[in-house]
Amino acid sequence: MPHKTEMARLVDRSSAAAIALRSVNTVEVASDGALVGHSTDGQGLMQNLRSHGVRLENSSVLVIGAGGAGRSVIDALTRHGCVHVTVANRSLEAAEFAVGFAPGGSRAISLSDEPALRRATQECDLIIHATSMGMGETGSEPVLPMPMDMLQQRHIVVDLVYHPLNTALLRAADEKGCQIVNGLGMLVHQAALQQEIWTGHLPDIQEMLSAASQALS
């Protein structure tokens, strides 16, 4: 998940979305030999949320993370009917930049500002964790991006982390009765879009999901 911002500075040119987001997760070798950057994260997440029946119209969302993945998510949420986003990040400066991709009236907060984080959680319908925190966790020391007492049963909780599939955040949310969505679907949907960029053909999503699930289980 890291290095997408750095990659945006290394390619020869980028798609309009990748330029705006300053995030590249896909590099295409063009016919002239140039390295062309693309961002498929946001579209991949939207397709995954749709497959889980998550509706974004008129929704309020808390996004934890303001890196390349977080910015892509925020931009996609805005394009798909979300009306308010709170961006929570360790660096308030990064959160303030990322909130520029959100609908008007959205706000940026520091993850260390617990009262603001609690208020944002109370106001939102959907919580999306968009950092690498928890990636590769063993379970011996659960890594949580926020205090779990903030979660309510009505929340939909999405974790972009896909290894492990059932992160500490998702386990805690499941115990609260929340609808949970792990990171595998987004990984697969955005990877399918990458394959389409590279080969011109969109692969079978279900076959990819099955193979990825087996590999990560």
PLM features: residue spans?
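Short glycine-rich anion-binding loops that position phosphate/pyrophosphate groups of nucleotides
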Residues: M1-E6, A69, S132-M135, H163
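Phosphate/diphosphate ligand-binding glycine-rich loop within oxidoreductases
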Residues: M1-H52
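Glycine-rich adenosine-cofactor-binding loop
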Residues: S39, V54, N58-T78
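Glycine-rich helix-loop-beta junction characteristic of Rossmann-like nucleotide cofactor-binding loops
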Residues: S51-R55, D149-L151
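Adenosine-phosphate binding glycine-rich loop
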Residues: N58, Q153-I156, L160-S217
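NAD(P)-binding Rossmann-fold cofactor-contacting core
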Residues: H80-P103
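Rossmann-like adenosine-cofactor binding region
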Residues: G104-I180
